[in-house]
Amino acid sequence: MPERVVIALGGNALQQRGQKGTYEEMMENVKKTAKQIAEIIARGYEVVITHGNGPQVGTILLHMDAGQSLHGIPAQPMDVAGAMSQGWIGYMIQQALRNELRKRGIEREVVTIVTQTIVDKDDPAFENPTKPVGPFYDEETAKKLAKEKGWVVKEDAGRGWRRVVPSPDPKRHVEAETIKKLVEDGVIVIASGGGGVPVIEEDGEIKGVEAVIDKDLAGERLAEEVNADILMILTDVNGAALYYGTEKETWLREVKVDEMERYYQEGHFKAGSMGPKVLAAIRFVKNGGKRAIIAHLEKAVEALEGKTGTQVIP
């Protein structure tokens, strides 16, 4: 049986540091990423793809902000912006990957699923919004918007004021069974983009909430739901490190999950960046996954072969 791998693409798969985020720039980056994924598929792995959406949701929110202030066009809520980003990014990845596979003589269906992720309406994150989203404002404008729209706003590292939203823990994907059926039918599925659209269950119905879900933690849930053997989180560094950015910096290669959990609890991994990646890797292996990998996007194939990156094992 071929091994099934969930590949979680970081922001650098779409937009490199210093780039403006034009369509042409993003498509060029996506084409490079598609080459890596196509090579993994050519080597016989079953692949499911998920991705981040931070800069793209930021762009959508800016577009809405400009449309509302300049033309009176009603802005849509945050969950809608998340769904829009899944369509935008998914379209680019599925097109580039299908083209790359065809170049190699591989005929496969590639499809994007707009995915909803259930979160607990009583998650403590809803009481403490921390995730900055959208444009920067001066203090006066930010506080005016907070009053008008019921937003929570905070000063963001001296750069201005921003809206902050909750980042609740993902529980499961509404479309999990559909995704699994497609994967088992040989379809390459792109799902849970940006962590999925956050929804809560209430009175037997689901409804969107204004929040952002960490895409690596949601990717871990996806990996469990499709019975993946491997979770591979691709980013812009070579893996996880102890004492990162200091003289004592030590890159981790192959680490048993209990040891990795100890490092996590000791606070070695920053909350907004490597922390969720390491937590996702720990959860996946503890919940029965064969291994989890954190590696550089450009070294995905080598990482899958165990030659680079951080490999978390049982």
Curated annotation (Swiss-Prot):
GO biological process: arginine deiminase pathway
Single GO MF descriptor: ATP binding
Annotated EC: 2.7.2.2
InterPro entries, per database record: AceGlu_kinase-like_sf, Asp/Glu/Uridylate_kinase, Carb_kinase, Shikimate_kinase_CS
Chief place of localization: cytoplasm
Source species, domain of life: Archaea
UniProt entry keywords in alphabetical sequence: ATP-binding, Cytoplasm, Kinase, Nucleotide-binding, Transferase
GO cellular component: cytosol
CDD domains tied to this protein: AAK_CK
Catalytic activity entry: hydrogencarbonate + NH4(+) + ATP = carbamoyl phosphate + ADP + H2O + H(+)
Record's subcellular location: Cytoplasm
Family: Belongs to the carbamate kinase family.
Quaternary structure and interacting proteins, as annotated: Homodimer.
Protein name per its UniProtKB record: Carbamate kinase
Gene name in the database record: cpkA
